[in-house]
Amino acid sequence: MSGPEVELVLGKIFERAIETKKRVGQIYRQFARLFSHVPEVEDFWRKMNINQNTHADWLKETKESLSEEQMLSLPEVELVLKMHSIKNLFDKHSKKEIGNLHDAYEVAHELEFSEVNDLFKILTSQFVSCEKKKNLILSEIDEHRKQIKNLPEKFESEMKEIKVEGG
């Protein structure tokens, strides 16, 4: 199989989802560097980066458990549409300048509550066979989102005052 059809197989969707989680992790790692002068904030972003890499590992394990027939099967249209939305989301955020913690929070909030985690949830729900592991992964996503939502409360009025290092 060659050409555009290759992009439409389930295996490619998994590969892109893995790349997406790693890319989000890189964004969070960059945030940790930008806020390295505020240890609590740096630690928050460092942990978020680790979580994203764990998600990528889970997706990789799930992909490796699929049969060749599954890997070459056509994915649901919803998965393909989510991949296109994710590309647009990254294009949008690649141009955004981060000047303070509030800017970083806005990017992270949009990523965590976007197609990035929607796609992760769908792939987990449909292809992780162990119910215990599936529930763990899905609860991890919810916990991750809660951590992002609670960031403004944690730093209250400091969100715009905590500038990037050198900013």
Where are these regions (language model features)?
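Non-heme di-metal
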Residues: 1-167
